[in-house]
């Protein structure tokens, strides 16, 4: 049996997505590992999708959370990059094969054997990974990030998913090569508001695209967008046809792509980042007649993620957050489902994750040699 350390978090046990106190085990810190005491963890929209099994591949119990900032409390003997007491981060992935074409190009996020921070098997198949809604995590040092000085631990946490999710496609699809290009950001939520900030830091002229005008003043006056386009205003949409070089589509709900394609210039590029539950219709005619492109992007590799953190620290880019207690997570998930957050929930794990000593132990199961105990 693998050596284990006791750990505690909040887990979903079924498709209701309700999170409850949960005792489980982490592996012992190995020679290549870093043990992290978790201070803060962001709440990503994919956490909501996963705990409710919207994508059909959830395996319960699940402790979500892949926007983790904490303190290194142990380092393995082969680890030279980190030392005890360092402020570190853990993002969406915690393992890959390290030998495929993608890994050799620092694109571990596209490795066929990528290991996700939660709802996945460990690299050796002996245990199930659990995420950052918990007190501690043990991670291979190659998938641990250094949090730069000046980057806050709480509002910096969402950058480990939301930040790299918008930063990587901006680099790959050529949005950073020439300042003054026009970028449309469809949707002003957890991803969208970071896309505005990073886009402006890259010298782009940013237009927020939204269904309503409620966030217009905030987008322009506080987030720094250059303009705001309401998709229900037919006259403004007509005036904006062919004005944008790029569009980053952050919307996860079902929506039409044709109005967005019409906004692109010839050779324009639309990059989809949201993950709707159902496939979207792709209007081929608009692409062909305008030599336009549609692409996608999934987070980034470790090297690029570290680069993104340094970039955000330099430009003082953080997420706009609402700090919550662990006990507030279920109401936060309900609000997230209604897009009732500006713009990211972050759990104050260190100050609010408290075991309930009086709670009754209801279930205990053994999963590939790893004992998991659920408490409610």
Swiss-Prot record:
Cofactor info, note text: Binds 2 Zn(2+) ions per subunit.
Taxonomy, superkingdom: Eukaryota
Alphabetized CDD domains for the sequence: CAD1
Positions that bind Zn(2+) 2: 97, 100, 103, 111
Reaction(s) catalysed (UniProt annotation): (E)-cinnamyl alcohol + NADP(+) = (E)-cinnamaldehyde + NADPH + H(+); (E)-coniferol + NADP(+) = (E)-coniferaldehyde + NADPH + H(+); (E)-sinapyl alcohol + NADP(+) = (E)-sinapaldehyde + NADPH + H(+); (E)-4-coumaroyl alcohol + NADP(+) = (E)-4-coumaraldehyde + NADPH + H(+)
Pathway listed: Aromatic compound metabolism; phenylpropanoid biosynthesis
Expression (tissue specificity): Expressed at the base of the stems.
UniProt binding sites for NADP(+): 46, 165, 187-192, 210-215, 250, 274, 297-299
Cofactor(s) essential for the protein: Zn(2+)
GO molecular function: cinnamyl-alcohol dehydrogenase activity; coniferyl-alcohol dehydrogenase activity; zinc ion binding
One Pfam family linked to the record: ADH_zinc_N
Gene Ontology biological process terms from the UniProt entry: lignin biosynthetic process
Keywords, comma-separated and alphabetical: Lignin biosynthesis, Metal-binding, NADP, Oxidoreductase, Zinc
EC number: 1.1.1.195
Binding site for Zn(2+) 1: 44, 66-67, 161
Family: Belongs to the zinc-containing alcohol dehydrogenase family.
Function of the protein: Involved in lignin biosynthesis. Catalyzes the final step specific for the production of lignin monomers. Catalyzes the NADPH-dependent reduction of coniferaldehyde, 5-hydroxyconiferaldehyde, sinapaldehyde, 4-coumaraldehyde and caffeyl aldehyde to their respective alcohols.
Binding partners and assembly: Homodimer.
The name this protein goes by in its record: Cinnamyl alcohol dehydrogenase 2
């Amino acid at each position: 049996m693998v050596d284990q350390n006791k750990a505690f978090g909040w887990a979903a046990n079924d498709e209701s997505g309700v999170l409850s106190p949960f005792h489980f085990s982490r592996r012992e810190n190995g020679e290549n590992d870093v043990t992290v005491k978790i201070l803060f963890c962001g709440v990503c929209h994919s956490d909501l999708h996963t705990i409710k099994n919207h994508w059909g591949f959830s395996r319960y119990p699940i402790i979500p959370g892949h926007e983790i900032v904490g303190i290194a409390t142990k380092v393995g003997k082969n680890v030279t990059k980190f030392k005890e007491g360092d402020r570190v981060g853990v993002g969406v992935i915690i393992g890959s094969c390290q030998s495929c074409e993608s890994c050799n190009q620092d694109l571990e996020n596209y490795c066929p054997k990528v290991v996700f921070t939660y709802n996945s098997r460990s690299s050796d198949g002996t245990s199930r990974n659990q995420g950052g809604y918990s007190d501690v995590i043990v991670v291979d040092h190659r998938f641990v990030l250094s949090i730069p000085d000046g980057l806050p631990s709480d509002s910096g946490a969402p950058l480990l998913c939301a930040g790299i999710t918008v930063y990587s496609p901006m680099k790959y699809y050529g949005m950073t090569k020439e300042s003054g290009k026009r970028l449309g950001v469809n949707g002003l939520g957890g991803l969208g508001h970071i896309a505005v900030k990073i886009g402006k830091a890259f010298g782009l002229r940013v237009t927020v695209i939204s269904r309503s005008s409620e966030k217009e003043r905030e987008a322009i006056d506080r987030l720094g967008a250059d303009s705001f386009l309401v998709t229900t205003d037919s006259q403004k949409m007509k005036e904006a046809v062919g004005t944008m070089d790029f569009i980053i589509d952050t919307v996860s709900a079902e929506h039409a792509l044709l109005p967005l394609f019409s906004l692109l210039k010839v050779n324009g590029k639309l990059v989809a980042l949201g993950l709707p539950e159902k496939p979207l219709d792709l209007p081929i005619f608009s692409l062909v007649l305008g030599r336009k492109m549609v692409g996608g992007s999934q987070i980034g590799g470790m090297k690029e993620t570290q680069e993104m953190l340094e970039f955000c620290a330099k430009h003082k880019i953080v997420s706009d957050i609402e700090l919550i207690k662990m006990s507030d997570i279920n109401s936060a998930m309900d609000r997230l489902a209604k897009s009732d957050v500006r713009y990211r929930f972050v759990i104050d794990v260190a100050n609010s994750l408290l075991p309930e000593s009086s709670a009754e132990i209801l279930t205990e199961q053994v999963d590939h040699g790893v004992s998991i105990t659920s408490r409610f």
